[in-house]
Curated annotation (Swiss-Prot):
The keyword Cell inner membrane does not apply. This is Dimethyl sulfoxide reductase transcriptional activator. The keyword Lipoprotein does not apply. Disruption phenotype: Cells lacking this gene displayed a marked decrease in growth under anaerobic conditions using either DMSO or TMAO as terminal electron acceptors. Residues 158-209 form the HTH bat-type domain. Involved in activating dmsEABCD gene expression related to dimethyl sulfoxide (DMSO) reductase. Required for anaerobic respiration on dimethyl sulfoxide (DMSO) and trimethylamine N-oxide (TMAO). It comes from the Archaea. Keywords: Activator, Transcription, Transcription regulation.
Length: 224
């Protein structure tokens, strides 16, 4: 019996500091087979290998009285305009969390804000629109000694400039305790003045506070 030679696989490990959720409205060029699934998609498990994409798609039962979900397997060959390819090009693992009409919601983890900027730019090249809806900072700067700081922002109701400022603030630790960056750092990163950064973040915080207050009122009003 021949002996199998053990080989050491090449492993690339890097810490992911940001969690993002993106709503991607697909263009015809970036059409995804998930759009063709009939019914409400409740879960997607997919594997992207080489030029092939395989997905197990769980679909909610059409009848409310039926508690059995259908699982559809979808296999397709990818192209350069495939969303999975774009994420892979940036070293990201996409997790599809929702499919509605022509919009796919994707969650992924990133190393830094530069990767986020590049990823969104490349997604916009193959999609109709790309919206960053949630951004979570998973770890504070190494110097702080705190690796459990989580800061999350819901960015859905912000303008593009406000979203950019909020993303930079979270990514650089502006909202961490202690702060990992100040207004000067953010101004340098964004290429704008400190006063402009301050104004944008004030608008962000105001919108987020208003949204949170409204949601709290609605929850209180619907409580029995």
């Amino acid at each position: 019996m021949s002996e199998r030679t053990a080989s050491q696989p090449n492993t690339d490990r890097s810490r992911r500091r940001l969690r993002v959720v993106l709503d991607v409205a697909l263009s015809d060029a970036a059409a995804c087979p998930l759009e063709e699934i009939d019914g409400e998609v409740t879960a997607v498990r997919h594997q992207y290998t080489g030029d092939d994409c395989h997905a197990d798609v769980t679909v909610a039962p059409a009848c409310p009285d039926d508690d059995r979900s259908d699982v559809m397997h979808v296999a397709t060959q990818t192209t350069d305009s495939c969303l999975c390819c774009v994420f892979s090009d940036h070293g990201c693992v996409p997790q599809i969390t929702a499919v509605a009409a022509d919009t796919i919601t994707v969650e992924t983890y990133l190393a830094d804000r530069t990767t986020l900027t590049d990823l969104v730019a490349d997604l916009k090249a193959v999609a109709n629109t790309v919206s960053l809806t949630h951004l979570t900072r998973l770890a504070a700067d190494d110097q702080s000694g705190d690796s459990h700081t989580h800061v999350t922002l819901d960015l859905f109701k912000l303008t593009d400039k406000q979203r950019e400022a909020a993303a930079a603030a979270v990514a650089k630790g502006y909202y961490a305790t202690p702060r990992g960056a100040d207004l000067s750092d953010l101004a340098t990163a964004l290429g704008i003045s400190k006063s402009a950064v301050s104004q944008r973040l004030s608008a962000v915080e105001s919108k987020l506070a208003t949204s949170a207050f409204t949601e709290a009122q609605q929850s209180a009003g619907s409580a029995p």
